[in-house]
A protein has these predicted regions:
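Conformationally flexible catalytic loops at phosphate/diphosphate-handling active centers
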Residues: 37-129
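Short glycine-rich or small-residue beta-strand-to-loop segments that form or flank ligand, phosphate
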Residues: 9-14, 137-143
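Short helix-loop-beta junction
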Residues: 153-163
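Structural beta-strand/beta-sheet cores of well-ordered domains, especially the beta-sheet scaffolds
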Residues: 35-37, 79, 136-141, 162
């Protein structure tokens, strides 16, 4: 939660497959909206688990991600650049407004990139996943690998006739 309001996009993975897929999509999303992006994966449950994943062929990945052509590269020989404070007080609010707008614009970009990724791999995720919500009386909001545990709990409760 320490970076919740930092202005970075965050993609959370339930499984190792989803983490891998998020990494591939993250490049395109971040570059399209000019915001940093984090692919978040549980620090023990998925990171220490052995799980098969379906890899995308290298050539398909290169084609999907594209060539990286930064407008302002920090490490460019012959053209040094320094990075200081986020913004001076005079420009801070305008910079934060632009950051907030980029965050809103990211929703459409995530949908578009996700659709293209789904066409390439058959795997789609969307912005938010719902599970058995059509007639639910209660809901859980959860991120990461705990979502799998929550789905199992929902299955058990449904088997007992609870909504």
């Amino acid at each position: 939660m320490g970076v919740r309001d930092a202005g970075w996009l965050m993609l959370f993975a339930e499984t190792n497959q989803e983490a891998y897929d998020n990494y591939l999509q993250a490049m395109r999303i971040a570059e399209a909206v000019s915001l940093p992006i984090m692919v978040c994966q549980d620090g023990f449950i998925t990171s220490h688990a052995i799980e098969n994943i379906d890899l995308v062929e290298t050539e398909k990945v290169k084609e999907f991600v594209g060539e990286y052509k930064p407008a302002h590269a920090l490490l460019k020989p012959g053209e040094p650049m320094a990075v200081g404070a986020y913004a001076t007080p005079v420009y801070y609010m305008e910079a934060k407004r632009q950051q907030a707008q980029a965050m809103m614009d990211a929703k459409d970009v995530i949908r578009k990139v996700g659709k293209e990724f789904g066409e390439m791999t058959g795997r789609t995720y969307g912005l938010i996943e719902t599970y058995m919500m059509d007639d639910a009386e209660e809901a859980i909001v959860i991120i990461g690998s705990s979502a799998g545990t929550a789905k199992e709990a929902i299955n058990e409760l449904r088997a007992q006739g609870k909504n």
